[in-house]
Amino acid sequence: MAFEFRLPDIGEGIHEGEIVKWFVKAGDTIEEDDVLAEVQNDKSVVEIPSPVSGTVEEVMVEEGTVAVVGDVIVKIDAPDAEDMQFKGHDDDSSSKEEPAKEEAPAEQAPVATQTEEVDENRTVKAMPSVRKYAREKGVNIKAVSGSGKNGRITKEDVDAYLNGGAPTASNESADSATNEEVAETPAAPAAVSLEGDFPETTEKIPAMRRAIAKAMVNSKHTAPHVTLMDEIDVQALWDHRKKFKEIAAEQGTKLTFLPYVVKALVSALKKYPALNTSFNEEAGEIVHKHYWNIGIAADTDRGLLVPVVKHADRKSIFQISDEINELAVKARDGKLTADEMKGATCTISNIGSAGGQWFTPVINHPEVAILGIGRIAQKPIVKDGEIVAAPVLALSLSFDHRQIDGATGQNAMNHIKRLLNNPELLLMEG
């Protein structure tokens, strides 16, 4: 038998991933630790190395397909490794042995399942923790129907099984489900006649788009958003960047306006610490964060990513500029790691790079605030009693009204405006 390599648990609480790219094909000879594939989990791309040396027999999952942790994704001819077990691959034989060691009382549901016909060849999709939970409860997990995505079994399914609900994943139930689907399909052809006038195509929702959608819905459903919009004369900031742009270039740094905004935001978070918290309503707690990590929303071909500048308060403008540029390149190339996209305490979203001005940015939950920056545009302003043209920056600050009051939000906005209006203050107060 070939060694069946299953999608491992790659951490971050992610139970599935999209196979973005295969680096091997049937017949390839591989060594241990060679990269087999790239898997998109949540918002990061993770390289999956081979745990064994051998010859690839068959790639089981095509590119663009979502696989669940524990699914066989590739078969490798590696005779010395056939019996090896890896994280995300539970040995189902243990689920048969352990329940036998425990004699459950006659009234408990598991005893009833002993007499039920269970397909032992059935493929089970379940996390290792769920398999362990089933064994502890004395349940043969192959007898449980999965209600999760792609039929994945959850702890709730095990509990339902114990309580007598949806007891088995029998062939009869599968057949009835299939019959129901077949019965419903005749309605579909009715839309075919409209194809000539109103053509439509469909595609699977990519893993990243699903992750973005889930995060946006969760944020808007959880946090009551309030957005403040303002603008600021940034002539001094413009001149300051122009003055140091060449010096930065000599050091290999591409200086933009964004690092200035990062430093101004960090200063505001320190002055108004309510913006640097998380509001945990379920636990009845407010989490105060004594570190300042700034997320930078980045637009890529695959969707929105938010790499994080860690400990931004300890870094110079040049250092922040370099880090933002490096993270942006990684984001575009799909090389960001999960660690590079977690831990933000507040986020900046730059719609100005796309030519926008004011907008209502969505909070990157569980953060409680997000600063949106628009484009810098020449506008008429009143200065010393005269109307003059000046570069003006649009700012939008969204915050969670459960934690931040309107006055606090506006005071934080005013502080940011003050620093960007006079960037030398960043050295004194930032």
Swiss-Prot record:
Residues 84-104 have a biased composition (Basic and acidic residues). Residues 125-162 form the Peripheral subunit-binding (PSBD) domain. Its EC number is 2.3.1.12. Residues 80-122, 164-200 are annotated as: Disordered. InterPro entries: 2-oxoA_DH_lipoyl-BS, 2-oxoacid_DH_actylTfrase, 2-oxoacid_DH_E2_comp, Biotin_lipoyl, CAT-like_dom_sf, E3-bd_dom_sf, PSBD, Single_hybrid_motif. Residues 177-192 have a biased composition (Low complexity). Its cofactor is (R)-lipoate. It is an enzyme of class 2 (transferase). SUPFAM superfamilies: CoA-dependent acyltransferases, Peripheral subunit-binding domain of 2-oxo acid dehydrogenase complex, Single hybrid motif. PROSITE patterns: BIOTINYL_LIPOYL, LIPOYL, PSBD. The active site is at H401. Binds 1 lipoyl cofactor covalently. GO terms for molecular function: dihydrolipoyllysine-residue acetyltransferase activity; lipoic acid binding. It catalyses: N(6)-[(R)-dihydrolipoyl]-L-lysyl-[protein] + acetyl-CoA = N(6)-[(R)-S(8)-acetyldihydrolipoyl]-L-lysyl-[protein] + CoA. GO terms for cellular component: cytoplasm. Pfam families: 2-oxoacid_dh (PF00198), Biotin_lipoyl (PF00364), E3_binding (PF02817). Belongs to the 2-oxoacid dehydrogenase family. The pyruvate dehydrogenase complex catalyzes the overall conversion of pyruvate to acetyl-CoA and CO(2). It contains multiple copies of three enzymatic components: pyruvate dehydrogenase (E1), dihydrolipoamide acetyltransferase (E2) and lipoamide dehydrogenase (E3). This is Dihydrolipoyllysine-residue acetyltransferase component of pyruvate dehydrogenase complex. It comes from Staphylococcus aureus. The gene is pdhC.
